[in-house]
């Protein structure tokens, strides 16, 4: 791997220590991407942490503050050279318009399950592309079906520079066969119609909690 994503956000000081320790362990040639999941809460905590982490050389910092505090993201972006990414702060086109108008971020993390599916995700990516904001297709630990949809969106726009669709790799049992397409650290989709996923109905029935037949 040439990059790592780290989840932090419980305590700023301990987060700083963990990130520095990881940098020491992996060396200087591996990209470190930090996802705070809103845990640093505000711009003051975030800027303090970024100052302490200046020597680490972060690839980007994801959603350090509360989701709806777009103004805090504006402040952070204006006071650091570390690229910042909005995740929880974007769910729909209205959010994207505000982000673009305020120039609040360098990157956005688009999640199909959060924004409403394939078409809304492509729409958000198109808006970001016009504003020069790079995109990532994010994961909510979905099955092969959801992950395949995300990969197809990712391949549709050049502005989508990264993906984190690893849900199928984390499941003991998955209803689809996308796992066969992972060629770590790459993904190689097939040429089958639709999403290219074959649903295993036996596994589907094993995982179902209830079913209804509509005639």
Regions found by a protein language model. Give the residues of each.
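Metal-dependent enolase-superfamily TIM-barrel catalytic cores that perform enediolate-based chemistry
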Residues: 1-80
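A cross-domain feature marking catalytic cores of carbohydrate-active enzymes
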Residues: 6-8, 34-38, 62-65, 86-88, ...
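Gly/Ser/Thr-rich beta-alpha loop segments that engage phosphate groups in nucleotides
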Residues: 11, 118-119, 140, 196-198
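Short amphipathic alpha-helical leader/targeting segments
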Residues: 18, 142, 164, 199, ...
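Shared catalytic-loop signature of beta/alpha-barrel
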Residues: 51, 57, 68-85, 90-186
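C-terminal extensions of enzymes
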Residues: 169-170, 174-215
């Amino acid at each position: 791997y040439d990059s790592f994503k780290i989840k932090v956000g419980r305590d700023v000081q301990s987060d700083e220590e963990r990130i520095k320790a990881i940098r020491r362990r992996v060396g200087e040639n591996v990209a470190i991407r930090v996802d705070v999941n809103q845990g640093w809460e505000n711009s003051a905590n975030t800027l303090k942490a970024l100052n302490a982490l200046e020597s680490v050389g972060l690839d980007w910092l994801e959603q350090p503050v509360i989701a709806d505090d777009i103004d805090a993201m504006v402040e952070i972006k204006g006071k650091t050279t570390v690229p910042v990414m909005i995740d929880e702060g974007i769910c729909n086109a209205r959010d994207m318009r505000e982000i673009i108008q305020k120039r609040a971020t360098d990157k956005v993390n688009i999640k199909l399950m959060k924004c409403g599916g394939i078409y809304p995700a492509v729409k958000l990516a198109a808006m970001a592309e016009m504003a020069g904001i790079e995109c990532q297709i994010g994961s909510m630990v979905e099955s092969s079906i959801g992950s395949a949809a995300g990969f197809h969106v990712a391949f549709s726009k050049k502005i989508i520079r990264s993906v984190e669709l690893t849900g199928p790799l984390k499941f003991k049992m998955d209803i689809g066969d996308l796992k066969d397409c992972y060629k770590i650290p790459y993904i190689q989709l097939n040429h089958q119609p639709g999403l290219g996923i074959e649903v295993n109905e036996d596994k589907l029935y094993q995982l179902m909690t209830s079913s209804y037949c509509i005639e």
